[in-house]
Amino acid sequence: MHGRDFLFTVGALAACAVPVHSREGIAFLEGDLTQLTQPGNGDNRATYMPDGKSLLFVSSRSGRSQIFRMRPNGGDAQLVHESKANDYGRVAPSPDGMRLCFSSDRDGENAVYVLDLDSGAVARVSDPAYWSFGPTWSSRDLIAYFSKKGGNQINTWTVRPDGADAKQITHRPGESRQPWWSPDGSTLALSVDNGNGAFQIWLSAEDGANARAITKEGNWQQPFWSPDGRRIAVSAKLDKSVFRILIMDAEGGDIREIAQPDNADNVHPAWSPDRRSIVFTSSKEKSGALWRFSFAA
């Protein structure tokens, strides 16, 4: 590793200094780094609610993977929905924040569901013949997720929140996964297998047309658009060390690295609605905790 060393004081839960660094050739963004949860509970894949007043995340703190909610600054977490099943993956709210889409094994195999927060009603929206995971909800009221049926080929699908009009929009060999909508709902960012075990970030229209790669080397995963649609946060491994949170412009250029814990895999970035912070999971020895990077004013 190359570059300068920086020390940031960790707030909320920890009272220690965490070393972070900048990589040679990638600009370093200064800001405040805050640990939101303690490791050991399997807290991961956080996403902000549309109003920015709370975070959704999945955690195994109750004995199985379930959906929780807490304030953006950390603190007590509340169970969102009681379930005897495991609810996995990133939770994506509807644009109005009244419903959530998520993955669960409640019917025996992973599928995508929609939860109405007022009534508590849960409805399956993905094809029961397919293993499905990782939904994201667009501003145009369309859900995208990735799915497979036997073998190792994984493709991205879209479906309406009522389960209608399901369409497979990628048709590549290998894996096309981890879709995330641009703020205007016109474009998907995807992680696409490049054939050697690593992934690149691709962009496509909502119907899968005009697909193209915007990264070329390394291993780039878990894209998440900024609220203004100008930048994308990713988890990337550019050498043989660990995954780091990077941000880039929507064409794959102007790459920056945020402050984050060192010697750990830092994954699943999510931008706040006001663009002022990014929350992510930092994992050491498979024990994840949620952290937040706040951009310098």
Which sequence ranges carry the predicted segments?
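N-terminal export signals
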Residues: 5-21
